[in-house]
Amino acid sequence: MMDVAILVDENTRVIVQGITGFQGSFQAKRMLDYGTKVVGGVTPGKGGSEVHGIPVYNTVEEAVAETNADTSIIYVPARFATDAIFEAFDAGLRLVVCVTEGIPLYDEMLIHRKLREVKSMLLGPNCPGVISPGRSKVGLLPDRSFTQGNLGVVSRSGTLTYQICENLTKAGIGQSTVVGIGGDPMPGLTFVDVLKMFEEDEETKAVLLVGEIGGTAEEKAAEFIKQMSKPVVAFIAGRTAPPGKRMGHAGAIIEGSTGTAEAKMAALRDAGARVAETLLDVVKEVRRVLE
């Protein structure tokens, strides 16, 4: 476990798959500006060129060999994303972050099968990435929402994370690491995986879990929270969502009585987490556990 942050820190060496595309190029520049060590990019057929002074390679394998990268972020369209993820796994990268939305569920099942055979960790797909404020950002999280501190944040929602962290930052509560696991039904890293990392991380004093309706990820997290020594605050989005209607994320759908906000909030409360009723209550509850 790293001494200073989970998943990424100032020594993380990042390549951008799809760096010559609009999003890849734009976000590579923003990561560079933040201080992230973006050491290379990959676009088949564009090897030998440069983007913002970052060398571009034809394959991930070549990029890793030349740059000693340990992390990749993927900005490629959904129909190419599975191959891009597999290529990153095969190159032996420690962490693969996939921002791409709309990867078919069947492909995600193939990705999960492959994950069991490799040493890589996958964050996403359909996620905003990860930031250790003041150290490194791998993803598209807006810098100004975050400041360095000792609250670990893990979330299924992207924009909600930015809003909550901005509120925390304005209230003087900084974050150790903020992890967006993504809103798809089958994420790589899960709430439980990230909670384990925060539990072991010396810099993290408390954890905020931001969940949403649909699936059972929050209920599984609640089971793990029972054995955590660190205080956990939770917020669940989607309390007013109608059953049977997909809300924004593919994973955000209530089927029958499973996946409702009430069921998740009850499970988290029973596990000993402090559950914030509204967005505005999050700061109050976090402040309470950090005092």
Curated annotation (Swiss-Prot):
Record-linked Gene3D superfamilies: NAD(P)-binding Rossmann-like Domain, Succinyl-CoA synthetase domains
Binding positions for CoA per the UniProt entry: T20, G21, F22, Q23, K46, V99, T100, E101
Annotated positions binding substrate: Y162
Assembly behavior: Heterotetramer of two alpha and two beta subunits.
Listed Pfam families: CoA_binding, Ligase_CoA
Protein name as annotated: Succinate--CoA ligase [ADP-forming] subunit alpha 1
Catalytic activity: succinate + ATP + CoA = succinyl-CoA + ADP + phosphate; GTP + succinate + CoA = succinyl-CoA + GDP + phosphate
Enzyme class name: ligase
Residue positions of the active site: H249 (tele-phosphohistidine intermediate)
Keyword RNA-binding on entry: no
PANTHER family (UniProt xref): SUCCINATE--COA LIGASE [ADP_GDP-FORMING] SUBUNIT ALPHA, MITOCHONDRIAL, SUCCINYL-COA LIGASE SUBUNIT ALPHA
InterPro entries named among the record's database cross-references: Cit_synth/succinyl-CoA_lig_AS (IPR017440), Citrt_syn/SCS-alpha_CS (IPR033847), CoA-bd (IPR003781), CoA_lig_alpha (IPR005810), NAD(P)-bd_dom_sf (IPR036291), SUCC_ACL_C (IPR005811), Succinyl-CoA_synth-like (IPR016102)
An annotated Gene Ontology molecular function: succinate-CoA ligase (GDP-forming) activity
A single cellular component GO annotation: succinate-CoA ligase complex (ADP-forming)
Task performed by this protein: Succinyl-CoA synthetase functions in the citric acid cycle (TCA), coupling the hydrolysis of succinyl-CoA to the synthesis of either ATP or GTP and thus represents the only step of substrate-level phosphorylation in the TCA. The alpha subunit of the enzyme binds the substrates coenzyme A and phosphate, while succinate binding and nucleotide specificity is provided by the beta subunit.
Family recorded in the similarity comment: Belongs to the succinate/malate CoA ligase alpha subunit family.
Keyword terms, alphabetized: Ligase, Nucleotide-binding, Tricarboxylic acid cycle
Native source organism of the sequence: Archaeoglobus fulgidus (strain ATCC 49558 / DSM 4304 / JCM 9628 / NBRC 100126 / VC-16)
